[in-house]
Structures are given as structure tokens and as C-alpha cells.
């Protein structure tokens, strides 16, 4: 079996030896149409870079032959997941909160790579609000008074440690 990082086409080589004759390499089987092999060297590649979030395993059969004999072996290529997707907000960009209470709501996000997300806020009213960096729960630092201010604006950033995205709230 082989392992290959997503978003890259290189897989590795099938290796065979014959003392007297040159060898020819071929692929067949379930996912052979997604792979290529150099018929003289056995070097394999994906025809297009794989995406872990679409398909994680490819199966094929490698056949090596000379002018008289052949051997074949089934193999798999396991696609290695990389942190290549930014988080995405799935909650509304607008929250309504009751006067004289600190609760606002929770920002909801998803990450196609399954990474743990952290949250932060910035912007005009960031000093009036807080966000739990692990859960995305938004709160007022002190209960708001409707007669004093009716609207607050912040930018929430969700990060998976490598990629981040923002939403204005």
C-alpha cells in the first residue's frame, strides 16, 4: 500500500526486477482510471490531485510483465488529510439580545478538515463583548441598556490554527 498527501499527484513506484529482460508496468482494477503508471519505470501518479474530503482510498492492481511471464498485485493508495480548508460560519450574522441581560448567542462554524476551532473578536464594539474562545458563545461584558445603545458591531474570527475566516456581526 501507499500513502499520498491530498492535493499532490505523486504516489510512489512499483518495483520489480528481472535478470534478463526489460519489464512493462500496467494498472487495472477499480480506481485504475484515476491513476497513471510509467510503463517503463513503475512510477505512479494520480491523474489529478486527490481531495481527502472527496475520496480517501484508491484501489488498483499493478501488473508487471516481460515477454513471457507476468505477476500482479492488488494495492491501495491512502490519501492523507491535510489542513487545507478554512472554517465556515453556519450561523446568522445577526443576533438579537434582551436588554439588561448579558447573553447574546453562539456563533456556529464547521471545518471540513475536522480541526478544533478557536474564536476571537475585534472591531468597533469588541471592548463591550466577549467570546468564549473554545465554544463561540458571545456575551456582553455588562448588561446593555437599550436607551443608551441599540446596536453593536464586531468581527468574529474562527481559526483552525492554520486557516481562518471572519464574519461581521
What are these regions (language model features)?
Residues 2-169:
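Acidic, turn/loop-rich segments in luminal/extracellular domains of secretory-pathway
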Amino acid at each position: 500500500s501507499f500513502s499520498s498527501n491530498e492535493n499532490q499527484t505523486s504516489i510512489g513506484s512499483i518495483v520489480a526486477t528481472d535478470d534478463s529482460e526489460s519489464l512493462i508496468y500496467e494498472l487495472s482494477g477499480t480506481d485504475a482510471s484515476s491513476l497513471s503508471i510509467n510503463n517503463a519505470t513503475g512510477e505512479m501518479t494520480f491523474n489529478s490531485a486527490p481531495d481527502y474530503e472527496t475520496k480517501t482510498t484508491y484501489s488498483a492492481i499493478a501488473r508487471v510483465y516481460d515477454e513471457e511471464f507476468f505477476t500482479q498485485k492488488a494495492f491501495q493508495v491512502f490519501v492523507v488529510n491535510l489542513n487545507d480548508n478554512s472554517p465556515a460560519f453556519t450561523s446568522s450574522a445577526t443576533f438579537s439580545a434582551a436588554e439588561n441581560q448579558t447573553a447574546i448567542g453562539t456563533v456556529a462554524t464547521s471545518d471540513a478538515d475536522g480541526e478544533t476551532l478557536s474564536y476571537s473578536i475585534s472591531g468597533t464594539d469588541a471592548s463591550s463583548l466577549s467570546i468564549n474562545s473554545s465554544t463561540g458563545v458571545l456575551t456582553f461584558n455588562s448588561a446593555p441598556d437599550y436607551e443608551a445603545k441599540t446596536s453593536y458591531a464586531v468581527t468574529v474570527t474562527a481559526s483552525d490554527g492554520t486557516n481562518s475566516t471572519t464574519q461581521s456581526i
